[in-house]
Amino acid sequence: GLIGIACTAAKPMVAPAGAKEAFFGTNPISFAWPRKGSAPIVFDMATSTLAMGDVQIAARDGHAVPPGTGLGPDGNPSDDPKEIIKGVLLPFGGYKGSAISLMVELLSAGLTGDNFSYEAGAKDNNDEGPPKGGELIIAINPTLVAGNEWSDHSELFLTKLKNMDRVRIPGERRHKNRLDQGPRFINKEMLEKVKRLLE
C-alpha cells in the first residue's frame, strides 16, 4: 500500500488568526498510512475549529457549538451555529492553525496553479456543488523510501503508542463502527427530510 496525503483549498469561510472576515477555506488535510494485517490509519480534518458541516448539523439540531468555533456576522465570538454560518469559522489552535491553513493554500493552489480559497469563492456559481479550489494529492511508496522494514518499524511505534493509557489510533473507532451491522438511528428531522425526498 501507499501512504496518502491530500489537502484542499475550499470556498472561504475561515478568518485568519486575528481577522474577522473569511479568507481561508476550511482547508481539510487527509492522511492515510497502510498497515499489514490491520486497517489502515486514515484521518481527515478541517483546519478550522469545526468543519462547516458540523456547524450546520448543530444549527439544524439546535445545539450550541464550543466557544472559539467562530464569529457571528457582527465579528464577535459566538457559540450559536446559525450566527457562525452567517459569520466566519476560526482556525483551530489560533495562529498555529492559521499557519497550517496558509500552508494548505500554498500547497494546494500556489504549488498547483489552481484556485486559492478566495478565488474559488469569487468563481463559485452557488449551485451547492463543491467549489473549484485547488487540491494537492501525494502518494508515497514507503518501501522505496524506507526499505522493506518500514512496516515492522512503524508497527513497533504504533504498538508503543497504543499501550499508553487512553490513546487511540486515528480512524480506529470509525473502522470498528463500519464493521458494525447493528441498527442505525436517525434523528426525526432527518428522517422527515428523507421521506419528503422520496415523495
How would you label these PLM feature ranges?
Residues 9-10:
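Short, ordered loop/turn segments at secondary-structure junctions
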Residues 13-82:
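Phosphate/diphosphate-binding glycine-rich loops and adjacent basic-rich segments that engage nucleotide
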Residues 22-28, 46, 99-125, 130-133:
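N-terminal nucleophile
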Residues 47-50, 96, 142-144:
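Glycine-rich beta-alpha junction loops
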Residues 53, 60-116, 123:
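Secondary-shell segments that build the walls of catalytic and ion/ligand-binding clefts
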Residues 111, 116-199:
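Catalytic-core signal marking the mid-to-C-terminal active-site face
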